[in-house]
């Protein structure tokens, strides 16, 4: 009996790597207030790293392009990525800047607030991307975020577009983007806040989500997915519009759920599924 060939997705993730320092508390403090927290732990983090790890755990062949400082946080992160079977050949080291860190507070409902000190992430350059051209050329999908310089995102997008590669952009943190970048992006994955930044429309319900998706699509992107947390995701795939509800689970901590969604979506699309099928898969993975 002939065993069918299953394509192993090749994904290049270009983005940030941080060390997350997480404190759990019953509630989040208000400005000027000091409260006592509970447990404290450190994890590998940064949107790029989280998405790379998610894609690797779902079976993809992942290359991660990023930059760390020459310090303990950076070296520890590098070892973690290697243990996840991520190709770290193009994680560069900046001898002058520290590795990125994120300070995260999580309340009893699983909601969080985050402050990021980007460090070496902000020195990831177009010249660094050039060194990984061959990997980009070989990839099925290029997955990016906005925790690295916008100039680098624009350069990598143009290069991937030139090579005919699928580009998925998670436009976080929220920022205004030029239409040339958006036209070369195959799928964009904003949350409510990022969708409002891109569309000028506040997303409060299904109707406003539909209007925001239309406004973003008018900038030249056929495929738009607005992630709506526990409600699910509103999807535009070419001329189809659909609300896909999230899987119902007990929420412990929402930190990183959006990054798992992005990583899972990139894997599913690279395996040949439609966008709607991929969003359903990503919803389940991020639950």
Spans of model-derived segments:
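Glycine-rich phosphate/adenosyl-contacting loop at the front of the ribokinase-like
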Residues: 1-67, 72-86, 251-252
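Conserved phosphate-binding/catalytic region of the ribokinase-like
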Residues: 2-11, 176-180, 206-287
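Structural detector of well-ordered beta-strand residues that form the stable sheet scaffold
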Residues: 12, 63, 143, 168, ...
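Beta-strand->loop->alpha-helix junctions that form or flank phosphate-binding loops
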Residues: 39, 65-70, 88-99, 171-172, ...
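Alpha-helix C-terminal capping segments
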Residues: 52-61, 106, 267-272
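Short gly/ser/thr-rich secondary-structure transition/capping motifs
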Residues: 85, 122-127, 167-174
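Conserved phosphate-binding/catalytic loop of the ribokinase/pfkB sugar-kinase fold
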Residues: 89-94, 104-141, 146
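Conserved beta-alpha-beta core of the PfkB/ribokinase-like small-molecule kinase fold
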Residues: 141-211, 231-233
